[in-house]
Amino acid sequence: MIALIDYKAGNLNSVAKAFEKIGAINFIAKNPKDLQKADKLLLPGVGSFKEAMKNLKELGFIEALKEQVLVQKKPILGICLGMQLFLERGYEGGVCEGLGFIEGEVVKFEEDLNLKIPHMGWNELEILKQDPLYQGINNKSDFYFVHSFYVKCKDEFVSAKAQYGHKFVASLQKDRIFATQFHPEKSQNLGLKLLENFARL
């Protein structure tokens, strides 16, 4: 059973509907105790890094997530801002500490690259390592992105990259911690396939 974490910073309905389409049982986790009932966790997210961390702290999710992910070793999937929160720090609205599951930081796309920010739309993935989420998904497949910030971390944690002005991290994997900068729930059949792969872990 997959817990969709409700910390007032994500569109849970679209993710829940996507899991329903593939027959994966899920529920909305509104408090830290709910995480104990799940065998997998999903952290969605839209909006500001700093505001999201503030919400997680106020709702008591930070220590609960660290217990479930780092000690209990439950698989977790972070989507978009959810992925960024897995890093050590972000700079949106000032320096802010993240969950620290993966070493690295979150920075904004450089405005001098003549890019439209946010990066919004379909983009091709370069899959770099065997990540169970990409089972049955071909390299160079397109997924849907909406973001102004991107992750900088060690290559060993990067499972896919995409190109927007320069190459950036499209997904991460470290042990049973998985994350996508793109939105699988908005990425049609391939997105559903990726969510199905996560549900089957």
From Swiss-Prot:
SUPFAM superfamilies: Class I glutamine amidotransferase-like (SSF52317). The keyword Hydrolase applies. This is Imidazole glycerol phosphate synthase subunit HisH 1. Keywords: Amino-acid biosynthesis, Cytoplasm, Glutamine amidotransferase, Histidine biosynthesis, Hydrolase, Lyase. Its EC number is 4.3.2.10, 3.5.1.2. GO terms for biological process: L-histidine biosynthetic process. Pfam families: GATase. It catalyses: 5-[(5-phospho-1-deoxy-D-ribulos-1-ylimino)methylamino]-1-(5-phospho-beta-D-ribosyl)imidazole-4-carboxamide + L-glutamine = D-erythro-1-(imidazol-4-yl)glycerol 3-phosphate + 5-amino-1-(5-phospho-beta-D-ribosyl)imidazole-4-carboxamide + L-glutamate + H(+); L-glutamine + H2O = L-glutamate + NH4(+). It is found in: Cytoplasm. It comes from Campylobacter jejuni subsp. jejuni serotype O:23/36 (strain 81-176). It comes from the Bacteria. IGPS catalyzes the conversion of PRFAR and glutamine to IGP, AICAR and glutamate. The HisH subunit provides the glutamine amidotransferase activity that produces the ammonia necessary to HisF for the synthesis of IGP and AICAR. Residues 1-201 form the Glutamine amidotransferase type-1 domain. Pathway: Amino-acid biosynthesis; L-histidine biosynthesis; L-histidine from 5-phospho-alpha-D-ribose 1-diphosphate: step 5/9. InterPro entries: Class_I_gatase-like, GATASE, Imidazole-glycPsynth_HisH. The active site is at residues 80, 183, 185. One of its GO terms (cellular component) is cytoplasm. PANTHER family: IMIDAZOLE GLYCEROL PHOSPHATE SYNTHASE SUBUNIT HISH. One of its GO terms (molecular function) is lyase activity. PROSITE patterns: GATASE_TYPE_1. The lineage of its organism: Bacteria, Pseudomonadati, Campylobacterota, Epsilonproteobacteria, Campylobacterales. Heterodimer of HisH and HisF. Its main location: cytoplasm.
